[in-house]
Each structure stands twice: as structure tokens, then as C-alpha cells.
């Protein structure tokens, strides 16, 4: 793990090998008569990083201008349904472990924490579901407009501003909160090497149907 954080290409010589143990992000190579595994860390390549950043900046600026009327309509819908601000800021962990303030359309009621705690007290069987993935299939905090925004992922659109400022990327591991560091385990070091993304592999591979372990696995695969 340490070598993968320092070098863009790492060759591993296993002590033991049995068929079926090769992770799909490594490539078998042969050095002499020895079977080795080559791990390519593409996101440590400065050229790839520069190209990715250029694409992020171009697409986010052009896309933001194109969808501006949609953003205005969404803002009006939020204000008409419930009181409170249109946008919601949340602290997440960004590149290098720095605090990242992500911007989203508000999809919950203003007293969301109070509503959540009351709901969990009245439905103790759902506490385990919440503690496992920090998600509920039928979340009582979410407004009607918010439910639609989340289903279509339109609540993430304001994060284009985070992308323009270089705090996020269009594609990458989803930004996590402090409480999720333990769940990430050894993969957290890999997570902090890149900019979090507006979308990522696990969002297009199953969303809420995936376990947290599967989400981490897909994020790590993308980084490698």
C-alpha cells in the first residue's frame, strides 16, 4: 500500500500464488521465470492529472452555462415547497485530507436532524440500516422535490462550482464525512490522493443497492 502511494507503477512479486487471486486492477507480467503483478497508478501521472483537470474545467464551465435555466427552475421549486435556503453546504473530506465544503441543492427539511432522531426512536429496527451505510431507503427528512432531485442526481449540480474551483472533479470517489474514515480502512490513503468526484463508479453501478464495502472497492478501483 505504501509503495502504491509513492510510485506510479509498482511490480509485486507474490510469495504464493493460486488461480483466482489476481485483482482485476493489476496486470500479470513475467520477469525471467518469475510471475509478477504490475499495478499501474494512473492518477499519479502528472500528464493524466493535467488532462483530467483541463477537461473538468472546460466541461463544468460550458455545462454550467448551458443548464443555468434548469438551475433557476430547481431553485424556485425548492423555495415554493418548503421554507429555508435553496443551497446546502456540508463539510466533507477532500484531496489531501483537507476539509471540503460541498454545495448541493437542499433536499431535506430544515430540522432534518431532529426529524431523523425522532424517526429512529420510533423505528429502532431501522437504526442498524442507518448505522451501516448512513442511508435510509425511506428517509423522512427528504422533501418531495428533494426526493425527485436525488433520484435524478440533480441535487449535485451546484457542485459544478466546486469543480471550477479545483476542489472536486467531475468523476472520482464520492466525498466522505469524518465518520466514514474508519469504514474506508486502508483504502482511505488512496482516497485522499485524488479530488472527490460529482459522480463515480458506485453511483452508476447500483447506488443504494451496494454495501459500503462494495462502494469502497469501486472507488479504489477507479483510483488505481
Predicted regions and their residues:
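Short, well-ordered beta-strand elements within core beta-sheets of diverse protein domains
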Residues: 63, 145-152, 220-224
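N-terminal hydrophobic signal-anchor/signal peptide
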Residues: 1-68
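Bateman (tandem CBS) regulatory domains
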Residues: 32-40, 58, 126-132, 139-146, ...
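A hydrophobic, helix-centered structural microdomain
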Residues: 47-115, 162
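Hydrophobic alpha-helical segments characteristic of transmembrane helices
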Residues: 6-16, 155-163, 204-207
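C-terminal terminal-structure detector
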Residues: 137, 165, 182-224
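Short, glycine-rich, amphipathic interfacial segments at transmembrane boundaries or analogous
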Residues: 24-27, 87-140, 199-217
Amino acid at each position: 500500500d505504501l509503495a502504491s502511494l509513492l510510485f506510479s507503477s509498482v511490480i509485486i512479486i507474490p510469495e504464493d500464488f493460486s488461480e483466482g487471486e489476481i485483482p482485476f486492477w493489476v496486470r500479470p507480467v513475467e520477469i525471467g521465470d518469475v510471475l509478477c503483478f504490475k499495478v499501474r497508478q494512473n492518477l499519479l501521472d502528472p500528464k493524466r492529472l493535467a488532462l483530467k483537470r483541463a477537461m473538468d474545467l472546460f466541461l463544468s464551465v460550458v455545462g454550467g452555462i448551458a443548464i443555468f435555466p434548469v438551475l433557476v427552475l430547481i431553485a424556485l421549486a425548492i423555495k415554493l415547497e418548503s421554507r429555508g435556503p435553496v443551497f446546502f453546504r456540508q463539510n466533507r473530506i477532500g484531496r489531501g485530507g483537507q476539509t471540503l465544503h460541498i454545495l448541493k441543492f437542499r433536499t431535506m427539511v430544515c430540522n432534518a436532524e431532529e426529524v431523523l432522531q425522532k424517526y429512529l426512536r420510533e423505528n429502532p429496527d431501522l437504526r442498524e440500516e442507518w448505522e451501516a451505510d448512513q442511508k435510509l431507503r425511506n428517509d423522512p427528512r427528504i422533501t418531495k422535490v428533494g426526493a425527485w432531485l436525488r433520484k435524478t442526481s440533480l441535487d449535485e449540480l451546484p457542485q459544478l462550482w466546486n469543480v471550477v474551483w479545483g476542489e472536486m472533479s467531475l468523476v472520482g470517489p464520492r466525498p466522505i464525512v469524518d465518520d466514514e474514515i474508519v469504514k474506508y480502512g486502508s483504502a482511505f490513503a488512496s482516497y485522499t490522493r485524488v479530488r472527490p468526484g460529482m459522480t463515480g463508479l458506485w453511483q452508476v453501478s447500483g447506488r443504494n443497492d451496494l454495501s459500503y464495502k462494495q462502494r469502497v472497492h469501486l472507488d479504489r478501483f477507479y483510483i488505481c
